[in-house]
């Protein structure tokens, strides 16, 4: 069976969840441009430094080097400043999107069939509404944004290098593709099983922890504490195993990235040295095309973690959609219609139940003919044997 990065259900669920994030497009575009300029400043810093060192070795007049020296300071300061502002904007976009998604999910759950929620353990529900929503929000900052930056910066770097040496630019483009596309795809397929196992193990860990905390007394009375601890430790072992698998794949990705950088430098030398000997390229330009690739792989190196985040986010989106239901429409939280109170409503809440029957979904009735009237100031106790669902 051919390994896939995402199944069709996961891809569909991820698109569905992203639509509920209601991402501010203009802020995202601003963050994308700032991130591209930040990494572009880093590459420009490396290229300018290479030119400055090579040109200074020829001992020209100081005024010839003054512009380059000032540019080095400019690129160094702007790199840090642009990254800081970009992260402020991008994280605001992601956090606001998570808020929108959670509000929409809560509103949908409040008006949906309670059987879907009751059938889940509390820890599993907590994981889906908590960490799974976070994973979907992280997709914006850790996958979409790095991919856009890598494409923009890579194209700009190759285009600028082509002005000096088309051959070196072609080699750099091939190495960037190897580092930014081929390596992430290979490692993402290897990481998929580890990510799926990790998500399931984290949900099981949350469920086991909630069971231990909330039901400790009942577990102790029935002699099930050791069994609960064993389930908790088993979930931790599964998480650690998935982390080791992801770490191995990440190590291979880092190796391919570093190897691509080395190939780009060696390729630039193999193309540039004959060009210098043929007086097609200057010695200073040779230093630029050789050293620029050293700072050109910063954006493509982020694609490995971006692909891993893609897998995690798609799995999380699928779990959230399974909670709501694949066919259940979800309205944005701000568009939910609020039901007005009756005209004769009192200022204090009053809960009344008449001939109420209680039971689990598809199970026997536990209580029938229950009449209940709860008003402020009145105490009502719900009593019964352990395990009936009080």
Locate the predicted segments by residue:
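ABC-type nucleotide-binding domain
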Residues: 340-390
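Cytoplasmic coupling helices
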Residues: 88-103, 107, 145-149, 171-217, ...
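Membrane-integrated ABC transporters
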Residues: 1-42, 135, 151, 238-241, ...
């Amino acid at each position: 069976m051919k390994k896939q990065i995402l199944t069709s259900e996961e891809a569909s669920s991820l698109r569905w969840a992203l639509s509920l994030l209601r991402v501010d497009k203009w802020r995202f575009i601003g963050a994308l441009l700032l991130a591209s300029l930040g990494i572009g400043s880093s590459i420009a810093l490396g290229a300018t430094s290479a030119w400055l060192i090579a040109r200074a070795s020829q001992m020209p007049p100081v005024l010839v080097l003054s512009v380059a020296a000032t540019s080095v300071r400019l690129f160094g300061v702007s790199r840090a400043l642009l990254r800081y502002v970009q992260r402020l904007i991008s994280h605001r976009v992601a956090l606001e999107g998570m808020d929108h998604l959670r509000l929409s999910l809560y509103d949908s759950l409040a008006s949906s069939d309670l059987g879907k929620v009751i059938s889940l353990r509390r820890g599993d529900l907590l994981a889906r509404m908590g960490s799974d929503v976070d994973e979907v929000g992280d997709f914006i900052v850790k996958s979409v944004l790095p991919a856009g930056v890598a494409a923009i910066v890579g194209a700009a770097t190759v285009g600028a290098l082509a002005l000096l040496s088309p051959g070196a630019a072609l080699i750099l483009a091939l190495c960037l593709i190897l580092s930014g596309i081929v390596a992430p795809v290979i490692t993402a397929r290897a990481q998929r099983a580890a990510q799926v196992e990790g998500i399931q193990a984290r949900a099981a860990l949350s469920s086991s922890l909630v069971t231990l905390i909330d039901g400790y007394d009942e577990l102790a009375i029935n002699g099930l504490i050791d069994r609960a601890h064993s389930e908790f430790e088993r979930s931790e072992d599964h998480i650690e195993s998935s982390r080791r698998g992801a770490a191995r794949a990440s190590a291979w990705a880092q190796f391919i990235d570093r190897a691509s950088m080395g190939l780009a430098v060696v390729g630039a030398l193999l193309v540039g040295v004959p060009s210098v000997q043929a007086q097609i390229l200057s010695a200073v330009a040779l230093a630029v095309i050789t050293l620029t690739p050293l700072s050109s792989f910063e954006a493509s190196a982020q694609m490995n973690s971006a692909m891993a985040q893609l897998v995690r986010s798609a799995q999380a989106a699928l779990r959230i959609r399974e909670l709501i239901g694949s066919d259940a429409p979800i309205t944005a939280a701000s568009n939910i219609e609020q039901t007005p109170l009756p005209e004769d409503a009192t200022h204090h809440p009053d809960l009344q139940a008449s001939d109420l029957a209680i039971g689990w979904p598809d199970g026997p009735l536990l209580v029938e003919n229950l009449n209940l009237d709860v008003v402020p100031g009145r105490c009502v106790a719900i009593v019964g044997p352990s395990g009936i669902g009080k």
